[in-house]
């Protein structure tokens, strides 16, 4: 069913870039990987596998399948620190730039190490490739409404790549947009608990 849905879209619409989020099982990962075998555009892989609580969302067999089937296809891998540690078999003694370099060895063309889980008044993200390391910094915002920050960032980067932006430009533009979305998040009043960022902050004043 999943492969049929992807095949239907790819055969009907020109797809300029693809973002992959959480894939729960090896069967789902295999279906996505098989469907994208002929796709030659940029692929952004957000390896969602650790909940904000620290609980694992993917079993070990799914993580292994993700590493084997999809990391080598990724134009950009966007892990946070706990996800990077999981992909690197629990290595926690590396700084983010070193984690990014180690993850390049698993196949992605570039890695964006997200620093939102770290401490400090400034969030530091690092774009790591074979040729360079580029930093993207933003002041940490005191809000409880940060649900979906990583997914939103990877989606915004993918949108930039679909518009033929260079990778560092797509990341910088997405970073600016997400900072505004977090800053405006407290204007929303949606449900109980951990609220979402304000995706439409540029339009809803």
Language model: regions and residue ranges:
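Phosphate-handling active-site elements
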Residues: 133-134, 160-174
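Short, small-residue alpha-helix embedded
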Residues: 85-86, 144-167
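Short pre-catalytic strand/loop immediately N-terminal to key active-site residues, enriched for Gly-Thr
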Residues: 133-147
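Conserved phosphate/ATP/ADP-binding segment of small-molecule kinases
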Residues: 60-133
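Charged C-terminal helix
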Residues: 169-205
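Conserved N-terminal subdomain of the carbohydrate kinase-like
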Residues: 1-52, 57, 200-203
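Nucleotide and nucleotide-moiety/phosphate-recognizing core
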Residues: 27-39, 109, 132-133, 167-169
